[in-house]
Amino acid sequence: MNTTQRAEYLAHTYADAILRLSYTYLKNTQDAQDICQTVFVRLLTEQREFESPAHERAYILRMAANACKDILKSPWRKRTLPMESAYDAAAPEAPDSEVLDAVNSLPPHYRAVIYLYYYEGYQAAEIGQILGVPTATVHTRLARGRAKLKAMLGGMEYEQPV
C-alpha cells in the first residue's frame, strides 16, 4: 500500500474516533483536529505493522490519548484562555445534550474512560491498555464517573430500566 492509499485508509477508518477521543480530552475542536493530524503524520512516517486491526486501533487511540496529555501539560495551554465570551449561534439542542454536556464537564480521566467504554465499546482491560493504567483503575474511574454523572443529572430521570 503506497503512502497516499495508507493516508486515505487511516483517515477513513480512524479520523472520527481520534477526533472524538481528542475532543473528550481537550474540549476544543481545533485542538482535536491538530491531534488527529499529528497522529496521522506519525503513523505515515513510522510505517509500523500490526498483528490485527484491533491492535492497530488500540495503538492509534493510545497515540491520540498521549498526544492530548502532552497538549494538556504544555505551558502554552496554561497561558491561553478559551474564547468563552464568544457568542454561540442558537441551535436546537439534541435530546441528549444535557447528558453529553455532563459527560464533557467530567475531569479528563473520568471522561476518557466513559467515552472509550460507552461510545467506542471497549472493555475495561482494553481501556487500561490504551490509557496505560491498570484494569482496576479503569473500573474505579468508570464507577466514580458514573456517580458524578448521576449526581449532576439528578439520578433516576436518565436511568434506563435493566
Model-derived features with residue positions:
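DNA-recognition helix of helix-turn-helix
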Residues: 65, 69, 131-155
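Sigma70-family region 2
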Residues: 27, 38-55, 75-76
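Arg/Lys-rich amphipathic alpha helix in sigma70-family domain 2
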Residues: 51, 61-83, 144
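A short pre-motif secondary-structure segment
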Residues: 113-117
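C-terminal edge and immediately downstream basic/flexible tail or linker adjoining helix-turn-helix-like DNA-binding
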Residues: 1-8, 80-82, 93, 129-130, ...
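Structural recognition of an alpha-helix C-terminal capping motif at a helix-to-coil junction
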Residues: 20, 34-41, 54-66
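Internal acidic/polar
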Residues: 70, 78-103, 123, 162
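A short, charge-rich alpha-helical start-of-domain segment used by transcription regulators
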Residues: 1-20, 33, 44, 111
